[in-house]
Each structure stands twice: as structure tokens, then as C-alpha cells.
Amino acid sequence: LNDGQEVNNYKTKPLVRDTDGDGLSDGVEVSVLNSNPSIKDTDGDGIIDGNEDTDSDGLSDAHEINVHNTNPKVIDMDEDGLTDAQEVNTYKTDPKVSDTDKDGLRDGDEALVLNTDPLKKDSNEDGTLDGSEDPDGDGLSNADELNTYNTDPNAFDSDLDGLSDGDEVNSVGTNPLAEES
């Protein structure tokens, strides 16, 4: 906000970053949250604006903006399948990077689908990156199953048609998600 806007439009103090003392800068209140930078509790619900959780992800708006630099209106900033709060509080991953350990798998897929560690490229320390592993033995890597074919990396035959997902993709040319393709 420029000084004129602060004084004339919002009745805030140009030399004070957070006029109402709610933990959010005046500019963020106006441009991101559409809250009133002169009133601590814009909506009058008894929760000051900085403590609100606009996206209901478990992190306060002030925490998202001031600590993690994430958008308090977006529940999963990096679209990896984990909420920003899950990344920060549970898995200790980066809520702005979908693949924190850079192994070719989204953090959410590692934590919720494969049960691998989204902070370690090679969770079982066998020399193969988690994204290159093929735990179901179907001939497709975890990364291919999750990122390319949308098949189940824990199922040898995702559509239960008697052909492995890898055979359908690499040999037969059928759809590993459609039993009759």
C-alpha cells in the first residue's frame, strides 16, 4: 500500500507495518485476505485476523504468511496431496515443494500411498531411489505408476484383468486401468 492509500482509504498508519496488531501486515490484509487492516477482528467472530485459518488447513493465516510464505487461502500450496499443516507439523516437508526429497514422487504419494519417507530419496537405503522402485513387481516404477499411468504402485494388476500393469503398458498396449481395453 502506498502512504496515500493507507491514510485516505484504510485509515492505517503508513509508518506501522501492522496497524491493528493482528500479526498481519496492512498490505497483506488488503491484497491477500481482504480483511480490514484497522480492525484486529474484521469479521467479529472473536478470533483476530492473524489467528484465523482461512483455508482450514490447520495453520493460522499469520503463520502461513510470516513463517512459511504460503498462501493462507490454499490448503495444499504445492498440490502434493498433503495439506500445508501436514507438511509442516507431521512430515516436516516443504509445503512449497511437491517433492521435498527430489526422488520423483510427490510427498503425499510417499506418505499416504507408498509409506516411504518423503524426506529420504531412498527410504529403504537399497541404492535405488523411491521413485525408481517397483515394489509390486509389475515392471513399472513407482514414479511411472503415480505420475504417468495413475495405476496403483502397490498392485501388480490395477484393473484385475490378469495382465500386469507393466505388460499392459510395455508389451500388449492396453490400458492398465480398464479391464476390457
Predicted regions and their residues:
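Extracellular calcium-associated, cysteine-rich motifs in secreted modular proteins
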Residues: L1-S181
